[in-house]
Amino acid sequence: MAPPSAPLLEQAPGEVGPTRRRGRRPRALKFADVAVYFSSEEWGRLRPAQRTLYRDVMRETYGLLGALGCAGPKPALITWLERNTDDWEPAALDPQEYRRWVTFQRKTRTRQKNEEKEVFPPKDVPRKGKRGRKPSKPRLIARQTSGGPICPDCGCTFPDLPALESHKCAQNLKKPYPCPDCGRRFSYPSLLVSHRRAHSGECPYVCDQCGKRFSQRKNLSQHQVIHTGEKPYHCPDCGRCFRRSRSLANHRTTHTGEKPHQCPSCGRRFAYPSLLAIHQRTHTGEKPYTCLECSRRFRQRTALVIHQRIHTGEKPYPCPDCERRFSSSSRLVSHRRVHSGERPYACEHCEARFSQRSTLLQHQLLHTGEKPYPCPDCGRAFRRSGSLAIHRSTHTEEKLHACDDCGRRFAYPSLLASHRRVHSGERPYACDLCSKRFAQWSHLAQHQLLHTGEKPFPCLECGRCFRQRWSLAVHKCCPNTHNGSPRPLIGGPNQRSSAL
């Protein structure tokens, strides 16, 4: 037996021998073989530093392949990375996924063109030039300016419902990430994650100055301007300054008066589509924001934030005059009128003025005689819901809050707090004119009528006005007051005869 012409090489199991590679040229290395791709969800989870590192590595890799002569045509991924944008684009997909996406977009555009031809037949539009040329653009301009259904997302107006549905399909392709709670759609998953915090109540961003928490970083940045006092946005018409650009934009509509977005249900007009969308919830009854503590639902996120402070006990707005704290800025503004004496709400019947609109509405019930709060137990009616709540405690006899000093019990903690000032001698409400102090705000309000001369309780029969409600009641019960029979006192005829 002849010896072999060449020595046999020992091979490890699974190793390809040199005879198998003979006659084959190695395949050239491509950028797609070494590149790393991200879906929109994966890209949204990357931190800014990770995205910067990814851009540098991919560019360096493509440059090395070019030095080896293996670069080929510039990939769509490199073109996207060279723009240094943080917004995800389909170019970041795997090449096979990217080709499928391009095919899907091409079919979608073809379907939309066919639908537009059905909605807007081009028979009345003149054609010029070559055969098969598309109709001219004035037809599409009329599509946006004519009246009809309104898109709740962008505020555009369409001639009919099919055109609106076609527009919504295009919007859904641009914003493929819907919110499972309210249906609002977003272009990127990071925006959806940030939006869902409005429903869950999650607030990961904390203010260093006051400890207030926010669901978005930009809201924290806007809030921190409150501590610095900076108002960088100036109105060019009146010079007024604002902390937010959105507040300036809303303010400028007071100068122009422009409100192009109309509610199809009631005809009310708004300056922005977002305000129109919030308003339409009053017609639909939609309340997309839910409190996780008590399951109460709200139409606006700001209302949910203010409500949640009831559970947390947070009161971030202190009064600089008496150090009392409030859960919302509107309640602080209303409270400060107690110290300033400002009363912007006037009664059109008796010229009495009030610091709060709710107090004016309650006062006007004296003129109308309306008592809209009836007791379901005895049928007695009251002008105020608070008076009804206090009255109902007489039926249930449930008084859970006891005074530590005298043992007297109360149905509500506010009544207990007011009563305890009798023992402590605390008088937190001071008159600005004579410095006299009172334990209850209602006593201060009655005292201030002596300085202003105001008499907010009118007699409906003779027109005479009184400073206090009980003075009006005594006036009505006096004999021959209105040239008629005297009205009985509250205690009945026996008490009245004994008093005489």
Curated annotation (Swiss-Prot):
The keyword Cytoplasm does not apply. One of its GO terms (cellular component) is nucleus. Residues 1-24, 110-144 are annotated as: Disordered. Residues 29-100 form the KRAB domain. The keyword DNA-binding applies. Residues 128-137 have a biased composition (Basic residues). GO terms for biological process: regulation of transcription by RNA polymerase II; skeletal muscle cell differentiation. It is found in: Nucleus. Pfam families: KRAB, zf-C2H2. It comes from the Eukaryota. Keywords: DNA-binding, Isopeptide bond, Metal-binding, Nucleus, Repeat, Transcription, Transcription regulation, Ubl conjugation, Zinc, Zinc-finger. May be involved in transcriptional regulation. This is Zinc finger protein 689. It comes from Rattus norvegicus (Rat). The lineage of its organism: Eukaryota, Metazoa, Chordata, Craniata, Vertebrata.
